[in-house]
UniProtKB/Swiss-Prot annotation:
GO biological process: valyl-tRNA aminoacylation
Record's function text: Catalyzes the attachment of valine to tRNA(Val). As ValRS can inadvertently accommodate and process structurally similar amino acids such as threonine, to avoid such errors, it has a 'posttransfer' editing activity that hydrolyzes mischarged Thr-tRNA(Val) in a tRNA-dependent manner.
Stated family: Belongs to the class-I aminoacyl-tRNA synthetase family. ValS type 2 subfamily.
Motif 'KMSKS' region, residue numbers: 574-578
InterPro entries with a match to the protein in the record: aa-tRNA-synth_I_CS, aa-tRNA-synth_Ia, Anticodon_Ia_Val, M/V/L/I-tRNA-synth_anticd-bd, Rossmann-like_a/b/a_fold, tRNAsynth_Ia_anticodon-bd, Val/Leu/Ile-tRNA-synth_edit, Valine-tRNA_ligase_type_2
Protein name according to UniProt: Valine--tRNA ligase
Keywords: Aminoacyl-tRNA synthetase, ATP-binding, Cytoplasm, Ligase, Nucleotide-binding, Protein biosynthesis
Length: 855
């Protein structure tokens, strides 16, 4: 017998220890029968919230199912503990900025913070029952990972996929680093559309509307549409920039929108991506007036060396400007503004402050002819939230644009769950217009294994580290054959995605067959079987991982990708610390327990955003309670650890429940093979509540007790109850691992319910279509009897003098076994089958008319 009440806290503590000690989730290390999961390493950027638990549970459902199916599961946990997200956490923790404390001290601070955060993450992931093999834990800042990440870079560089170039890039002036296209979010911001009066050399006034008037000092051309009749006479002429008097060409280009603003556009270097396009297409000069701090810097245009745009390291030393390979050679133009009022008033101001000042100056001079408040989309950094600038700097890139078609082919080779997410990836790839910028001007990340030569005759030559010397830090180490005076180290670090994009290879301990660590398992687990992730990182993690696997090995990184939706807060927005709408998991786990939280996460369909719901948690709690109580009831009729058998099942309604169970096993298995955990749980839960608890337990219990029935009928009920409960526990085990383990241990075996090969096999059952149909008719009649009793305000146990049933056809009449159970469950003294009965309730399918005589 089970205890009266189920204590989830006691049980969770017990099995967290037992599972780890018994190594039930340990990967055996053999290629045969291995199922490899590429898991998302949580970013060390703060505390985990319930939204993180949401997606990690989805992966665990599949891991537990595949393990019980008989697979040897390779299920690692990683921690993404390098890069900008971690740096921001450290800066917030210590209330300082990286540059204020210096590189070495800041890196020490990073290690201190991530160690504490990792322990908190581990405790939380364990507390919700994620079945990782903790011996496979990895970290994106570990020696092994840095080695593999640097191997990846060297392989890509040698193959011509990685290159360094000076070009306009997206710049975050708060975090003071380049970022990639995938790290942008478009925000709708309030602004103003300002109309500025320019003139031509012939003194004709022309109006240009812009949201960035502070950039007019960097104007290098004026554009109109070639079919705009208003300005056809201006094409080929020269415009004069107001205040500073600089002359710029007026050029026709089809990318001008005739109906936007005044139809004239000033090209400034750089306000947006269109400015980049025009500057490069028409070979226009560059006038850079915004610096890396996001301030107006008019002095920079007098610096012919352009040092701040040639890869300054964070210490202020030029670290990578010597490189000439692949660099563009823009011609710069000087703006004659020194010793003028406009220079004095705006130089050194932040961009938004300068914008206000410029509008004021233009208004005072009568050069602002209009200003309209608008809302428009602004490109912002995903992490810092700040508006991005476009600055020309030296950066490292990985090619994407010239490989779109090939990567799209790889995307189509992969199985996407749900399939609609593949289209999202395809749209992203087709819309790419930048190569992937992988260098970051930060401290805490994987260093580029690169130096630049100062030797005479090879100035600027890229020197790669030898593979056998990896990992290297160019700031501390030297390349073979060079002295300190002969090289300049690359001071940048890699974008954290550049490392996270090789998580399948990190698990394999090899980038490909050429670049590997000792004792690698590349041939055993690469490519992986499954990648599980949420949909917002399709354009980053999924895309970059597919790209790198293609470049490194012409392979997919995994065969299947399962994409979860977001967990939304009550306001239907994604949970995030910045929005202040996060829900911490600890309080929910303390209130409901891990199984109930897991139940809530399983009630979300793949790829669909789900609002956090206390109501679903309450339903989950009722399920856990009902499972315990139903098991407690069944345990009355069985000996502990008795053999589970159905070889003596003889009664129709027992065969009915087993036939229903056959279908549920089939449906749940097929759903989980397609990674549809929500549908699988729904099928099992529906069977448990409706078929097993509401119906079968009631009709079988008197036979199970042995009241006025044959020993044969009694044994049939006991075997069926014992077998069905055992199977229900195993079907629910991936979702509710704790309570199913506790009941299974108490009643069925001292082995774990989660053991490999313990998934129910429908072939153990014989599907009996006749018994299922007979049982369904039984249930139609029983439901009408229950309704009649309810309509007469009597309990379901109220004695019936006579139960009268009319069947439309003789073949629908219940057999004697089913009639015996019907008479018992309805508490009827007798059942009369009548061909003449007209009054009574009719079943939905019209097969039966039912009436009763009550005492």
């Amino acid at each position: 017998m089970l205890k009266e009440k189920y204590s989830f806290k006691e049980v969770e503590n017990k099995y967290n220890i037992l599972w780890e000690d018994s190594r039930v989730y340990k990967w055996d290390g053999k290629k045969e029968n291995t199922f490899t999961i590429d898991t998302p390493p949580p970013t060390i950027s703060g505390k985990l919230h319930i939204g993180h638990i949401f997606s990690y549970c989805h992966t665990d459902f599949i891991a537990r199912f595949q393990r019980m199916l008989g697979k040897d599961i390779f299920y690692p946990i990683g921690f993404d503990d390098n890069g900008l997200p971690t740096e921001r956490l450290v800066e917030q923790t210590y209330k300082t900025r990286a540059r204020e404390v210096g590189r070495e001290k800041f890196i020490e601070m990073c290690h201190e913070v991530i160690e504490k955060s990792k322990q908190e993450f581990k405790e939380l992931l364990r507390s919700v029952g994620i079945s990782y093999d903790w011996s496979l834990e990895y970290h994106t800042i570990s020696k092994e990972t840095v080695t593999l990440s640097q191997m990846s870079f060297i392989d890509l560089y040698n193959k011509g996929y990685a290159y360094r170039k000076m070009q306009p890039i997206l710049w975050d002036p708060v975090d003071k680093t380049a970022i990639a296209q995938a790290e942008i979010e478009d925000k709708v911001c309030e602004s103003s559309l300002n109309t500025i009066t320019f003139s031509t050399e012939e003194n004709e006034q022309i109006d240009i509307a812009t949201t960035r008037p502070e950039l007019f000092l960097a104007c290098v051309a004026v554009f109109c549409h070639p079919e705009d009749a208003r300005y056809a006479h201006l094409i080929g002429k020269t415009s004069v920039v107001p205040i500073i008097g600089v002359k710029v060409p007026i050029i026709a280009d089809g990318r001008v929108k005739i109906d936007k603003g005044t139809g004239l556009v000033m090209c400034c270097t750089f306000g947006d991506e269109l400015d980049i396009y025009w500057q490069q297409k028409h070979n226009l000069p560059m006038k850079i007036i915004i610096d890396q701090d996001g301030k107006i810097n008019l002095d920079s245009m007098y610096d012919n060396n352009r040092s701040q745009y040639q890869g300054i390291g964070m210490t202020g030393e030029r670290s990578t400007g010597v490189i000439k390979e692949g660099a563009i050679s823009p011609h710069y133009d000087v703006i004659p503004v020194r010793n003028t009022r406009i220079y004095d008033e705006i130089n050194g101001l932040k961009v938004k402050e300068a914008r206000k000042k410029i509008i004021k100056i233009l208004t005072e001079r009568g050069l602002l002819t209009g200003s309209t408040n608008i809302s428009h989309s602004v490109k912002c950094a995903e992490r810092s939230g700040v508006s991005l600038e476009i600055l020309p700097t030296y950066q490292w890139f990985i090619k994407t644009l010239d490989q779109k078609a090939q990567v799209l082919d790889k995307v189509k080779e992969c199985n996407w769950y749900p399939s609609t997410m593949r289209k999202r990836m395809e749209v992203w790839i087709e819309g790419l217009n930048w190569d992937w910028c992988i260098s970051r001007q930060r401290y805490f990340g994987v260093p580029f294994p690169v130096w630049y030569s100062r030797r005479k005759g090879e100035e600027g030559k890229v020197i790669l580290a030898e593979v056998e010397d990896l990992p290297v830090d160019p700031l501390k180490d030297l390349p073979k054959g060079y002295s300190k005076e002969e090289v300049v180290p690359d001071q940048d670090v890699m974008d954290t995605w550049a490392t996270s994009a090789i998580t399948p290879q990190l698990s394999a301990l090899a980038v490909n067959s050429e670049f590997s660590l000792p004792d690698h398992r590349y041939n055993t687990i690469f490519p992986a079987d499954l990648r599980s992730q949420s949909h917002e990182i399709i354009r980053t993690w999924a895309f970059y991982t597919i790209l790198k696997a293609y470049y490194h090995a012409n392979s997919l990184p995994w065969k299947n990708i399962m994409v979860s939706g977001w967990c939304l807060a009550d306001d239907k927005k994604k949970m995030s610390k910045s929005k202040g709408n996060i829900i911490t998991p600890k309080s929910i786990l303390d209130t409901y327990g891990a199984d109930v939280v897991r139940y809530w996460t399983a009630n979300s369909r793949l790829g669909v955003d789900t609002v956090y719901s206390e109501n679903i948690l309450k339903i989950g709690k009722r399920l856990v309670t009902k499972l315990w109580n139903a098991s407690k009831f069944v345990s009355i009729f069985m000996e502990r650890y008795q053999a589970v058998s159905i070889n003596s099942v003889s009664e129709t309604m027992d065969q009915w429940i087993l036939s229903k169970l056959y279908k549920v096993i089939e449906k749940a298995t097929n759903n989980l093979l397609q990674f549809e955990y929500c549908e699988a749980l729904g099928a099992v839960e529906g069977f448990f509540w409706k078929d097993f608890c509401d119906n079968y337990l009631e009709l079988a219990k008197k036979r199970a007790y042995g009241d006025k029935v044959s020993s044969k009928a009694n044994l049939s009920a006991k075997q069926s109850l014992t077998y069905v409960l055992n199977t229900i526990l195993r079907l629910l085990a991936p979702f509710l691992p704790y309570i199913t383990e506790q009941i299974y241990h108490q009643l069925y075996s001292d082995n774990s319910v989660h053991n490999r090969g313990n998934w129910p096999n429908k072939e153990e059952l014989i599907y009996d279509k006749h018994s299922e149909e007979m049982g369904d008719k039984f249930m139609q009649i029983l439901n009408l009897v229950r309704k009649i009793k309810a309509d007469n305000n009597v309990s379901v146990k109220h004695l019936i003098k006579k139960l009268m049933i009319k069947a439309n056809v003789k073949e629908d009449k219940l057999n004697q076994s089913a009639q015996n159970d019907l008479q018992t469950v309805c508490n009827a003294e007798m059942i009369e089958w009548s061909e003449n009965a007209q009054a009574g309730l009719i079943t939905e399918n019209g097969k039966f008319i039912v009436s009763i005589d009550l005492y």
